[in-house]
């Protein structure tokens, strides 16, 4: 009877051992599956840190300095000159906008600001020219006034026909002749001052009178 109990006990132990081995194998299989799934998972994408305005500006400056240090060919020099010219034209345009921006405070006869006033008729353009000229005449004492008008004429007459430009040229010629006539007659703004001849000092008579004195006159 004891042998039978021992046999049953050994059988029960072996069955438990087999169950434990099966459970351990299943657990190991699940761990391996999870490990494989983790490996095939896509790695997380790196987070792109957004630059601040200051950092972006600094980065742009560094790239520009690096570009300037590199040797330039003829084509690069041409592009650089073209870029400078475009920047200058943009600067001139901005200056013109700033110059005429003050006109918005003045109103036309219709009561609307001059910046929104769109002249259509000849009378409208006459009124518009008067307002613009009144504004520009505030700067006629500047030494850059004539240079400003040369630059202004090149820009505002770019789309004017040759015949109209010829009429404008005739108007300028009339103004020049009137200005010359006024300057010659002394009525112009720049009057020619008459030069006063320096006074001559006549020492001849004084020296002659001095020679007429005799040494005895001082005795």
Swiss-Prot record:
Summary of subunit composition and partner proteins: Component of the eukaryotic translation initiation factor 3 (eIF-3) complex.
Coiled coil segments of this chain: 48-100
GO BP annotation list: formation of cytoplasmic translation initiation complex
Descriptive protein name: Eukaryotic translation initiation factor 3 subunit J
Pfam families tied to this protein: eIF3_subunit
Keyword Coiled coil: yes
Role of this protein: Component of the eukaryotic translation initiation factor 3 (eIF-3) complex, which is involved in protein synthesis of a specialized repertoire of mRNAs and, together with other initiation factors, stimulates binding of mRNA and methionyl-tRNAi to the 40S ribosome. The eIF-3 complex specifically targets and initiates translation of a subset of mRNAs involved in cell proliferation.
Subcellular localization, as worded in the UniProt entry: Cytoplasm
GO CC terms: eukaryotic 43S preinitiation complex; eukaryotic 48S preinitiation complex; eukaryotic translation initiation factor 3 complex
Acidic residues bias spans: 22-40
Region annotation (Disordered) ranges: 22-47
Organism: Dictyostelium discoideum
